[in-house]
Regions:
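Bacterial N-terminal signal peptides that target proteins for export
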Residues: 1-9
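Bacterial N-terminal signal peptides
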Residues: 8-17
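Acidic, polar-rich low-complexity tracts and alpha-helical solenoid repeat scaffolds
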Residues: 21-344
Length: 344
């Protein structure tokens, strides 16, 4: 047994001490993070001056070598954050993430670009890039785990992206549409699966607030303002479909549609809004008829009259309105008899 130990030990020592070069080194650098570098490329992209380092990133971008763009641009920003070359490097860093399919991280890097270097970039162009990214997520693109593995859709994150666009540039060209799409994202979330109705209604409420803000902040743009009021109405209308919120929220929906019709009568959505108002008022009239019948059975004629009158006010030409008029004629004599008895 001992005869085998010494040779094996010798072989192990020689193996461990034998000089080897890793064919695929993974390197960590403070501020730059982990990176993979092939044996032939190690250090070739690194420079000692900001301009030279940025030039490496730009040359790599021209060749669509986005891995090198990422490394060179990130090093420029980390090592020389206050240099004149940092803004362009930050933009290239964001573009490298976008080109490599990590849209969420790209959005964040564009956001850093606008916050830290707002005077050194084409503000509108950067925000348009952010809108394209947010639009992809709103369209159903999945957010990725570790920037690599498509995992889940998130309308909440999509809404927050649009809201960040607005927060950073509230008067920019894309801000009104970003505010509207934030509301659209919350509506999509409300239409999805929820553990409770309360959570669903919270999301509709967030959509309402987004559209309300769009109207208040951008009402000088008639197209945006009219659409904001319309979408505010549809959000309230969808919320009202739950019985708990029926009357109060239905009135909010009607008010939003009526505001749109009064302020922007020529909007393409005018006819649809009118039809929605009529439908909701007809449904409210039906509810009033039901309550009126309850009072009528109890021989509470005056109470019944109140609700029949309400049904007529809401939808005079509807089936429910006509029914209310007929019942009012019937109970009128009972009301007179009751009044006569009370007078005696």
């Amino acid at each position: 047994m001992r005869r085998w130990v010494s040779p094996l030990l010798l072989v192990a020592i020689v193996f461990l001490l034998w000089p080897n070069i890793s064919p695929a080194p993974i390197i960590y650098r403070p501020g730059e993070g982990w990176s993979y570098e092939s044996r032939g490329a190690m250090g070739k992209w690194r420079r000692d001056r900001a301009k030279a380092q940025l030039d490496v990133a730009k040359e790599a971008a021209a060749k669509e070598d986005w891995r090198t763009v990422y490394k060179a641009a990130k090093r420029t920003v980390h090592e020389w954050p206050l240099s004149d070359y940092a803004p362009e490097a930050q933009q290239l860093l964001a573009q490298s993430y976008e080109a490599r399919g990590d849209d969420e991280r790209a959005f964040k890097e564009y956001q850093k670009l606008l916050r830290y270097y707002p005077q050194n970039v084409d503000y509108e162009e950067v925000q348009k890039r952010q809108m394209l990214i947010a639009d992809r997520f709103l369209g159903g693109q999945r957010f990725k785990l570790w920037g690599k593995i498509p995992l889940y859709r998130s309308w909440k994150k999509s809404a927050e992206m649009y809201q960040e666009v607005v927060n950073v540039g509230p008067q920019s060209e894309v801000a009104p549409m970003a505010q509207m799409k934030a509301g659209e994202a919350w509506e999509k979330r409300a239409d999805g699966f929820h553990v409770s109705e309360r959570e669903r209604h919270k999301d509709f409420g967030r959509a309402v607030e987004a559209y309300k803000k769009a109207y208040e902040e951008y009402q000088t743009d008639d197209t945006v303002a009219a659409e904001a009021l319309y979408k505010k109405g549809t959000s309230y209308e969808n919320q009202s479909k739950d019985a708990e919120y029926d009357q109060e929220v239905t009135m909010e929906a009607i008010n939003a549609y009526e505001d749109m019709l009064a302020l922007y009568p020529g909007t393409p959505k005018a006819e649809d809004a009118s039809q929605r108002i009529a439908k909701m008022k007809t449904e409210q009239a039906r509810g009033s008829i039901t309550i009126a019948k309850f009072y009528e059975k109890k021989k509470k004629w005056h109470g019944a009259k109140v609700y029949y009158d309400r049904a007529i006010d809401l939808a005079p030409d509807s089936e429910h309105g006509q029914r209310a008029k007929e019942r009012l004629a019937v109970i009128a004599k009972y009301m007179d008899e009751t009044d006569a008895v009370e007078t005696e």
